[in-house]
């Protein structure tokens, strides 16, 4: 990961969130302990995610952005900026808020980073693909994409702007697919199905999944591209420290069913599988995606060769080392082998 020769500090926005805190954790594993981390902690408990992590300075977003606007050199030489801070709620209806928070702020930060000769890596989203279910490639005509919600559109707006401004070949956009893992407890209804199903199973002994309304696809056989958060940040750091440019899918490249996901949760909890299929709300039926699967050819061609954590391995680690004991990333229980990674944990015990 030495494709760039820049010197200076690292900045991570959204640093207390699911992906942001995992990225700071990954930076720590690579010996980086002087990052500047930025977020909006508010009244949530996501501050707990920062406690075991090592960094040099924390700033609230409302302090950080005015400081760099007033003095672009406020933090000295900057080597890399990982912009993961955004409103990620696909149900958010305030378009004005999403434009300001997800689009304008990203424009301002990208302009500042490039002006400082810093590497700029930002969170785009697989939501930009809209209802498309096949051939999810990064080189698709961006104007052919139609996001299904305002969140996805706010991300697409920046992708389009970066292309128009001619800077997409100097920065990296990460199209995250279905990311799950520790440190998502603050996300409420936007948590992964792993977290929500874990709660359902421990409270009721069953998991509710939507019925299928597409001929040939049975209930629970709808698929998603699930990716463990530790893989997601390993990819982000690889791309940030390589000569990569443009948009990259961040997924496993393998579509798995909701039934597969839930079965892995029951296995991790050593409970018998018990799934209840429920009707899908009418408002959702017309725009529900029955399949997502990232193409990862560009990622592999960009030199990322590490294997992806299997769904069974990732779910087992997330549940047994984090959710059950109630721990955050960096405070986890040791793995059975002591290796500390999902890949060292057997898919079944």
Where do the model's predicted regions map?
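N-terminal Rossmann NAD(P)H-binding glycine-rich loop of SDR-like oxidoreductase domains
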Residues: 10-30
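SDR active-site strand-loop-helix element
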Residues: 13, 38, 81-85, 120-126, ...
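Glycine-rich phosphate-binding loop and adjoining beta1-alpha1-beta2 segment
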Residues: 37-65
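NAD(P)H-binding glycine-rich loop region in Rossmannoid oxidoreductase-like domains
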Residues: 52, 61-101, 130
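Catalytic helix-loop patch of NAD(P)-dependent Rossmann-fold dehydrogenases
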Residues: 100, 104-108, 115, 119, ...
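NAD(P)-dependent short-chain dehydrogenase/reductase
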Residues: 134, 160-234, 264-266
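C-terminal substrate-binding subdomain of Rossmann-fold SDR/epimerase-dehydratase oxidoreductases
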Residues: 201-349
């Amino acid at each position: 990961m030495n494709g760039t020769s820049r010197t200076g500090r690292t900045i991570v926005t959204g640093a207390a969130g699911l992906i942001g805190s995992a990225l700071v954790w990954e930076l720590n594993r690579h010996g980086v302990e002087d990052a500047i981390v930025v977020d909006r902690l508010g009244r949530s408990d996501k501050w707990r995610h920062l406690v075991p992590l090592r960094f040099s300075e924390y700033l609230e977003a409302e302090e950080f952005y005015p400081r760099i606007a007033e003095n672009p050199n406020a933090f000295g030489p900057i080597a890399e900026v990982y912009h993961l801070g955004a409103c990620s709620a696909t149900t958010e209806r305030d378009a004005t808020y999403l434009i300001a928070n997800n689009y304008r702020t990203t424009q301002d930060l990208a302009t500042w980073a490039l002006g400082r000769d810093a590497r700029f890596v930002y969170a785009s989203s697989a939501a930009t693909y809209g209802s498309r279910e096949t051939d999810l490639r990064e080189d698709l005509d961006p104007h052919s994409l139609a996001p299904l919600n305002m969140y996805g559109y706010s991300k697409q707006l920046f992708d389009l702007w970066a292309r128009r401004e001619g800077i997409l070949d100097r920065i990296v956009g990460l199209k995250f697919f279905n990311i799950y893992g520790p440190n998502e407890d603050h996300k409420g209804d936007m948590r992964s199905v792993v977290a929500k199903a874990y709660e359902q199973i421990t409270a009721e002994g069953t998991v509710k999944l939507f019925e299928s309304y597409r001929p040939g696809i049975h209930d629970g056989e709808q698929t998603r591209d699930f990716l463990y958060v530790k893989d997601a940040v390993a990819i982000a750091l690889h791309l940030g420290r390589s000569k990569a440019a443009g948009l990259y899918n961040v997924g496993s490249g393998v579509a798995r069913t909701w039934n597969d996901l839930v079965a892995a949760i029951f296995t991790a909890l050593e409970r018998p599988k018990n799934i209840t299929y429920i009707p899908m709300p009418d408002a959702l039926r017309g725009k529900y995606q029955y399949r997502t699967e990232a193409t990862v050819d560009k990622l592999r061609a960009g030199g990322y060769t590490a294997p992806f954590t299997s769904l069974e391995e990732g779910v087992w680690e997330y549940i047994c080392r984090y959710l059950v004991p109630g721990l955050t990333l960096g405070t986890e229980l040791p793995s059975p082998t002591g290796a500390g990674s999902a890949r060292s944990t057997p898919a079944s015990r």
